[in-house]
Curated annotation (Swiss-Prot):
Residues 104-142 are annotated as: Helix-loop-helix motif. Residues 284-293 have a biased composition (Basic residues). It comes from Mycosarcoma maydis. The lineage of its organism: Eukaryota, Fungi, Dikarya, Basidiomycota, Ustilaginomycotina. Keywords: Nucleus, Transcription, Transcription regulation. The gene is RIA1. The keyword Transcription regulation applies. This is Regulator of itaconic acid biosynthesis. Its main location: nucleus. Residues 266-275 have a biased composition (Acidic residues). It comes from the Eukaryota. Residues 90-142 form the bHLH domain. Disruption phenotype: Abolishes the production of itaconic acid. The keyword Chaperone does not apply. Pfam families: HLH.
Length: 381
């Protein structure tokens, strides 16, 4: 069997077509070539409308190519030249989307600015130039307030008070070295520190001395005669403690004086020092017993609050000096913003106080005595 594309003299094995048939059938082309053994010749018929190839055309001595046979099967491949065009179009679309998003964000920003300046959610739209002008005016007002605060600080000479100490317990922010300590920043830091100190001191109760605490604990037991007994016992305890302290002090003084004056005397006699201490104790108990029951009830507090169980033994000064937890950088920034806002809000009242103090320091005319009396009566009422 001979194939198209081969010369007449070339011989190939008979199963060569069987090897190539599945490859031709597996292509996307619907046209298959097959040999007909009934004709007894090597003619090739096609299922297409093309005319069958003649035997003379096949038996020509010139070598025929396989191009006519494969030209009927269209080759399908992806056009690589159309890819750059699609990418450029998508790039243009992306650029337009970015531009739209940018314009939308700008319009949204102006809408937010309008709501902030006018405090109205359903306000009429205002032109961008007017909004920008109003924002600039607000910034100028804030600058004026800041300048006024700096002048107040410089006028009263408060710059030295706002100098930051290196031994501060608060954690410094990461950009503390690059921060410029202007009077405003220093004032805000001081306000934040005082606010933290007030919070820490308000959480801790006021602590009395140990003697007062014991006396109050004894007085809280009951409201009848047992209170008097406990009161008397506490007073006697205090008197005995003070007497023993005075006796020890006087004995030490007498010992030192005797050692200076009489070096030969080795013993120090304490009998003389005990007499005035005992007499003072007796006088104090007599005076306490001489008081009538009404006077003792009068000094008794009417309202006795219950003792708080969560009283910490640390004094309030220590609690106020150290905060509960070291603030982080975010907390410090938030406190700084709050301090600046509070400083700006307190400026008008502070200015009024300064004006009132100046007016009060100047000599003014005496007011009408009748009006002063009426005011005092109203206050007493």
């Amino acid at each position: 069997m001979r194939f198209a594309g081969m010369s007449c003299d070339d011989e190939r094995p008979a199963n060569m077509f069987d090897l190539m048939a599945p490859q031709l059938a597996s292509t996307s082309c619907n046209e298959h070539y097959f040999s007909t053994a009934d004709l007894g010749a090597s003619t090739l018929y096609a299922t297409t409308t093309d005319a069958p190839a003649t035997i003379a055309g096949i038996l020509t001595p010139q070598p025929a190519t396989l191009a006519p046979m494969y030209s009927t099967c269209p080759v399908r491949f992806d056009d690589q030249r159309s890819a750059p065009a699609s990418t450029s179009v998508s790039g243009k679309r992306k650029h337009s989307d970015v531009e739209k998003d940018r314009r939308r964000s700008i319009s949204n920003g102006f809408a937010v600015l309008q709501n902030v300046l006018h405090n109205e959610s359903n306000a009429k739209p205002i032109s961008k130039s007017i909004l920008l002008q109003q924002a600039c005016d607000e910034i100028r007002e804030l600058r004026k307030k800041l300048d006024a605060s700096t002048t107040i600080i410089s006028r009263f000479g408060l710059e030295n008070l706002f100098v930051p100490t290196p031994s501060s317990t608060h954690a410094s922010p990461p950009n503390a070295s690059s921060r410029i300590y202007s009077p405003i920043n220093q004032a805000s830091d001081v306000l934040a520190d005082t606010r933290r100190a007030s919070i820490s001191t308000s959480a801790t109760p006021i602590l009395y001395s140990e003697e007062k605490r014991k006396a109050n604990a004894k007085r809280r037991h009951s409201y009848d005669g047992s209170w008097q007994a406990s009161d008397r016992g506490s007073i006697d305890d205090e008197a005995s403690a003070s007497a023993s302290a005075s006796a020890s002090a006087s004995s030490s003084a007498s010992c030192s004086s005797s050692s200076h004056t009489h070096s030969d005397d080795t013993d120090c006699d304490d009998t003389d020092t005990d007499i005035p201490a005992e007499s003072a104790l007796k006088e104090r108990t007599k005076r306490h017993k001489a008081r009538s029951k009404k006077e003792r009830d009068r000094t008794k507090p009417r309202y006795r609050p219950k003792p708080s169980t969560n009283r910490s033994p640390t004094p309030s000064s220590c609690a106020s000096s150290t905060p509960n937890s070291p603030p982080t950088s975010s907390n410090r920034n938030r406190d700084l913003q709050q301090a600046i806002l509070s400083l700006l809000l307190e400026l008008p009242s502070h200015l009024e106080d300064v004006k009132n103090k100046r007016r009060a320091s100047q000599p003014t005319e005496l007011a009408d005595p009748s009006s002063v009396k009426s005011r005092s009566k109203k206050r007493h009422r």
